[in-house]
């Protein structure tokens, strides 16, 4: 199965799961130091004698039979490589407030009015992954990352081929779209800003490769009265001072945007007011009744001016 890493930057929590088990491959043999004559040398150090043949998997042909099949009833098992994540950790999470897009609204008329600001922009979430360069373990599996940002935000995800050398960078688009209506008095102006948290974090996942099973051996002439032997692969590794486990580290650096909100700044007073997007907003720090009074007074004055203008026209 593929590997899955779940990380929540806001909570600083991370977990990982998945496992791959397969018959030991040639690349695994190289990684554990059992390729070519190294396998024979390891058996020699364990048994004190160079074997005629040594195998970690079928076909292990000796005496006209496959030793793993012929002695399966005695518990002889091909060597299996097991790869699994054992820990995931979030390092150095950090966020800064940044302005995504702005809009300037001005009322250049002689009447109060409502002005609409459409705020939209597109940016990217990104992830760059790198691997331990010397592990030598090859697995045809992907690693999927689900990265949560802050509470209530939808997580974003990436998928990489496991263990691919060098760095891989992936980016996904993030769209910010909102609209707000602002009530402005004559001559008044504001800057409406769409802001978001821009964040960074590093996610480190540690994997472990281990082996189980037996190394099948053939000795001719017989060794201690027997041609065929099988011993735990880990016993043979330990006798040769070779590792019984290999640890691989994967590092992912993520950059993200989240937790957007809108505010506005009065062009004259410089006052910044946080706002939503479902109401009509008045940037001045006045009570609604006071603004309503001003609007009604202004409307009455306009009506009075119209009436006086009509009288002058009749004369």
From Swiss-Prot:
Source species, domain of life: Eukaryota
Residue ranges with Basic and acidic residues bias: 299-315
Region (Disordered): 295-315
Functional summary from the UniProt entry: Structural protein.
Protein's recorded name: Spherulin-2A
Species, as recorded: Physarum polycephalum (Slime mold)
